[in-house]
Structure formats: structure tokens, C-alpha cells
């Protein structure tokens, strides 16, 4: 009986990237585990948490792709958001309790001036309701206990902040930003600049690095596919590193690299590169700028978007 149970839960090796359109009300981890179950994947991770209230692009890394998740964690991101003016909440979003209210008297000009003030290199104080840790404990645990701890402001870059529309006391905005940006904090800061307070009521992530939500699949659509067809939705592992220079090695060089050897190679400027051997993605290497290539992060299987 025990052997039969183990057999039923046996996972398969799946390598690739699933671009998931996360629904509202689901945690990122719950979405990950559902997708992992539908793909019967042995190993999976995600590349940047979305709050339960948020929807949109959540790239999931499977198998060998988990080794390169940091590439997306460090990437720029884009969002569309709705900010409700006149009410500030303790969480910065609609799930929190109101802590301040004020009448809303804004104009198109005042809105655009406030958006301009929040564009460029700015500093943000991370919200208490966040997963950042203090003394090994997430800030949201302190917040739930009614404890507020001091947080240092952190530099972030808002590449663009665009007004999409105004409906009553709500603003629709589009944000293009660096990693580490809290759109909830932007909503709070925007409300304060407008003199009336504000909080986030809707958030949708539309882009991470090279990936767009238009390319993503919902859990409902994934589940509707025949089990054997689902893996066909995966992007290959090297889609995570497509922005890096490409180095091609012959079979002999590739063999040495996979043994951890440093090679002489025409790899140009210093920095990370993606390495291929006879067309196969081998992983990441680092060039020193003087013709020397060192292995940094290599795949341990043939890294494709298909099951091995």
C-alpha cells in the first residue's frame, strides 16, 4: 500500500518557464503549487511574489530553470493599478483598515504634477505589511501583532508613471519600475502628494523583463488542456537569460566547461554570458574581459522546455 501511494505521487522532471496569469484571491505560492500539480513537476519556484489581491504575470520556473530565477527577480517590472483617493489604509490597499480620510479636490494638472514628482530615482519606505524581514521575521508578522518597526528608505527607480484614466475618486495608472518597488507605497505617496490620501484597490502585473502578460496562461486554461499537452506551454530555460551575450562552444570546449574548467574563449567584454555547446544551452559563464571564460551556473540536464 505504501509503495502504491509513493507511485501515485511520483513527480517527473520538467524543465522550462511557465508564464502564469495569476487570478485575484490566490497567493503566489498556492498558484505555484496548483501549476506544479497540473504539470506533475518535480521541482518548481516563482520569480517574485504577487499579493493575493493582485493579478497578472507570475513566471514559474520548473526544474533547471529554477537555477536562473534571479534573472527575473532583478528585472524591471510593469503594472497597471487603481488608486482610490480620499482614504488611506494601514496596509496601503483595500484589505486594510482606514486610518485617515479627507475630501478629494484634484485636477488633471495636480494629478500629473504628483505623478511627475514620483517619477525617476526616488526613495520608498517599505510597507509594514510586506515580506521583508527584520531579525529573521517578516514585517507583516510585526504588523499583525500591532508592532511598527523602523524601516530604512530604499532607492528605487520609477521609469514611467502614466495616468490612464479617472473615474470618480479613483485613478488608473501604469507603472514601469525597477525591482523592489512597492506599488502600494506609490499609492500612499500619490495620495499624500494630492493632499487627500489614497490606497491601492487593484493591481495587475503586465510585464517582467522580456515577458508580457499577453503571453501568459490562466490556471483554468492550463487545467483544461490534456495532461500531455501542458508541458508544450513552457518557454525554454534559456528564455530567462536571453538578454545576455551568447557564446558558442565546440564539443571539446563544452566538455571541459561542464567539468568546471576555465577556458580561453573569444567572449568580449567582462560580464555574464549564456553558453551553448552544439546548440544546447549549458548555463551561465563569466568573461573576465581578457579572453577567459569561467563557468558560473550550469544546467545538470539537457535544458529544454520538454520533459527529460
Swiss-Prot record:
Annotated CDD domains: PseudoU_synth_EcTruB, PUA_TruB_bacterial
EC annotation from Swiss-Prot or TrEMBL: 5.4.99.25
Gene3D superfamilies for this protein: Pseudouridine synthase, PUA domain
Domain of life according to the entry: Bacteria
Active-site residues, as the UniProt record annotates them: 51
Keyword field: Isomerase, tRNA processing
Alphabetical list of InterPro entries matching this protein: PsdUridine_synth_cat_dom_sf (IPR020103), PsdUridine_synth_N (IPR002501), PUA-like_sf (IPR015947), PUA_sf (IPR036974), tRNA_psdUridine_synth_TruB (IPR014780), tRNA_sdUridine_synth_fam1_C (IPR015240), TruB_C (IPR032819)
GO MF terms held by the record: RNA binding; tRNA pseudouridine(55) synthase activity
Record GO biological process: mRNA pseudouridine synthesis; tRNA pseudouridine synthesis
Record field: catalytic activity: uridine(55) in tRNA = pseudouridine(55) in tRNA
Entry similarity comment: Belongs to the pseudouridine synthase TruB family. Type 1 subfamily.
Role summary: Responsible for synthesis of pseudouridine from uracil-55 in the psi GC loop of transfer RNAs.
The protein, known as: tRNA pseudouridine synthase B
